[in-house]
C-alpha cells in the first residue's frame, strides 16, 4: 500500500528555505513512490493549507520548520519534527528517517507547543559558551548541537567557543545584556564575571552533545541569577563536588600545548641521530634544549599553576606555578604537580575568603598577601611532606613501566586502551590521557603511544562499519561515518559519539574491545610516541613515532575489530533499506 505523508515547511523569512525544502521533499516522495500533501509557508507564493481530509489520510506528518506551527490539528498522528535545513542535503534519506523515528503526537504535547508560555520561550535570546580540556572536538560539536536545537525550537542563539585556538565567535557586551539566558557548557574553568545578574545554567559538553534538548529544557527551568561575589554557600559546595575534575582538566588543557610543542621539537632533534643532541653547539642540541630543557621543564609548573588558577583565580596562579616547579625539581613528577596545584589553589582560596583586612589595605591582598602566604605554605608542604613520598611513587612507577615484561605491558595496554574507548572523551578517557601525558615528563613514551592509538580506534571503527555494512545505516549515518573516519585519523575519539548516543550497548563494547587490542599491541611492539596529540599526522615529524609500521598495524587491527564487530552486532531490524 502506498505511503501517504503530509509535509509542512516553514522558515522565518518564508522565502528561500521553505520553498526549496518543499520542492525537494515533493521530489523525494515521488522517488520513494509515496503520495505527499505539502503545506509550504511562504511570503512570496500562494501557499496550500493542509485540509482535514489530507491530514486524516496521512500515515505520517513531517514538520521541516524553523518557527511555530499549529500542532493541534495533528493530534493522534505520527509526527516527525526537525529544523528545515535537515532535509536539504539528502531528502530521500530524510523521509526514511522520518518514517522510522516519528512518534504519535499527544494532546498534551500539542497544547504545550501552542501555549503562550511556549510561544514566549520561542522568542528567547540565548548566549552560550562551550569549552573542553583539549579544545578540539567536544567544544565545537557541543556548540553545533546547541545551535541546531535552539534554532529548531525557534530561539535566537550565539555560541562562543573556547577551543585550542582561543575564543571564537566572541560574545559582545550588547549581546550579553540582551540575552534572556546564558548557558555554560564547559568541562574546564571559564571566567563568568561578565554574566553578573544574568540567568545562567552550567552543564558539561558531554551532556550538551548527547542530550541537547533535555539540557536546553533544563537551562530554562533551572537557570539561576549569577553573581560572582554573592554565590550562596550551598551553591559553592555543590559546585565544588564536581569542581575537582574541572580544575584538573583546566590544568591539563593549559599544559597540552606546552607538551605537544616540546614533544615534537624533541622528535625533530632525533632527525640528526638519536644521540646527536649530546654534541654541544649543534642544531640537535639546540632543539633538545628548546623541547626538553625548556618546554618539558614548564609542563608540571603550568599544570599546577592552572589547577590553582581554576580554584582561586589569579591569586592562585603564582603559588601554583611555584609548587609545580618544586614538584618538578624534587622528582615528584606530574602526580606531585597535581597535588601542588590543589594545595596552592585551596590555600589561596581559603586566605581570600577568610582573611579580612581594612579597606585601606584590601588592594594588597591579591598582589602581596595571598601569593606570599599561599606560596610559602605550598612550598613548605611540597618540600617537607609531599615531595619525598611522591618522588618515590614516581620513581617506582617509572622504573616499573620502563622495565616491565611483555605480559605486564600487554595488561597495561589493555587497561589504557579500554579506558580511552569507554566514554569517548569523558572523565575515564581523560584520566587515561592525563596519565600518559604526565609520564612524558619522565621520558616514558610507551603508554602515550598506546593511549593515542587506542583513542583513534572508535572513530575509525565507526567509519569502517558504515562502509562495510552500508545497508545497515541510513544515508545520514553513512555521511557521519566518513566524517568520523577523518576525525579518527586526527585522534579525535568524539567522532564516534553520534553512533554511541544512538546505540550505546553495541557501540561502546565494540570500541572497547578494539581499543584494548590496539593498546595491547602497541605496548607489545614497544611503540613510543613523543607528542600527545595529532593522530597519524604526527607521522610527518620524523621519529615522533617508532616503530611506525608496527604502530600502524596495531591501529589497523583495532579498527578492524571495532568496525567488523559493530557491523555484525548491529541488529538486522535496524537496517535501513536503500530502496523504498
From Swiss-Prot:
It is an enzyme of class 2 (transferase). One of its GO terms (cellular component) is plasma membrane. PROSITE patterns: PTS_EIIB_TYPE_2 (PS51099), PTS_EIIC_TYPE_2 (PS51104). GO terms for molecular function: carbohydrate:proton symporter activity; kinase activity; protein-N(PI)-phosphohistidine-fructose phosphotransferase system transporter activity; protein-phosphocysteine-sugar phosphotransferase activity. Its EC number is 2.7.1.202. It holds the Pfam family PTS_IIB. Residues 244-579 form the PTS EIIC type-2 domain. It catalyses: D-fructose(out) + N(pros)-phospho-L-histidyl-[protein] = D-fructose 1-phosphate(in) + L-histidyl-[protein]. The modification Phosphocysteine is found at residues 11, 132. Residues 3-100, 124-221 form the PTS EIIB type-2 domain. Keywords: Cell inner membrane, Cell membrane, Kinase, Membrane, Phosphoprotein, Phosphotransferase system, Repeat, Sugar transport, Transferase, Transmembrane, Transmembrane helix, Transport. The keyword Ribonucleoprotein does not apply. The active site is at 11 (phosphocysteine intermediate), 132 (phosphocysteine intermediate). It comes from the Bacteria. The keyword Cell inner membrane applies. Disruption phenotype: Does not affect growth on fructose or on glucose. It is a multi-pass membrane protein. The PTS EIIB type-2 domain is phosphorylated by phospho-EIIA on a cysteinyl residue. Then, it transfers the phosphoryl group to the sugar substrate concomitantly with the sugar uptake processed by the PTS EIIC type-2 domain. The EIIC type-2 domain forms the PTS system translocation channel and contains the specific substrate-binding site. This is PTS system fructose-specific EIIB'BC component.
